[in-house]
């Protein structure tokens, strides 16, 4: 099909995975009702008029907890393949993983010391 043999299946998958959402959006555009009456523009919240505004200020502590979670979630993404291939990688990969974990533990200690993990 093209210059890289063996990638035909990948190219087919790529084309299909791009075509399906585009086809869904085009179909929605063609078949969806187009009337924009005042009734359709109202917000709906469990059959009642909404109370208060939609824009509220979140406490910064939510952001800090989410940021620390994402950091350690990404750590898991990096360490899982290493753990699966641990027996083939040798001592150097083990030392590199220990350095990676040590850097993240220093970051955790810093966040803890700064009070980012405390809710007061």
From Swiss-Prot:
Q: Report one GO cellular component.
A: plasma membrane-derived thylakoid membrane
Task: Name the UniProt key words of this record, in alphabetical order.
Answer: Membrane, NAD, NADP, Plastoquinone, Quinone, Thylakoid, Translocase, Transmembrane, Transmembrane helix, Transport
Q: Name one GO biological process term.
A: photosynthesis, light reaction
Among the Pfam families in the record, one is: Oxidored_q4
Coiled-coil region(s)? none
Compartment(s)? Cellular thylakoid membrane
Q: List all membrane-crossing ranges.
A: 6-26, 64-84, 89-109
Protein family membership: Belongs to the complex I subunit 3 family.
Subunit structure comment from the entry: NDH-1 can be composed of about 15 different subunits; different subcomplexes with different compositions have been identified which probably have different functions.
Protein name according to UniProt: NAD(P)H-quinone oxidoreductase subunit 3
- Name of encoding gene: ndhC
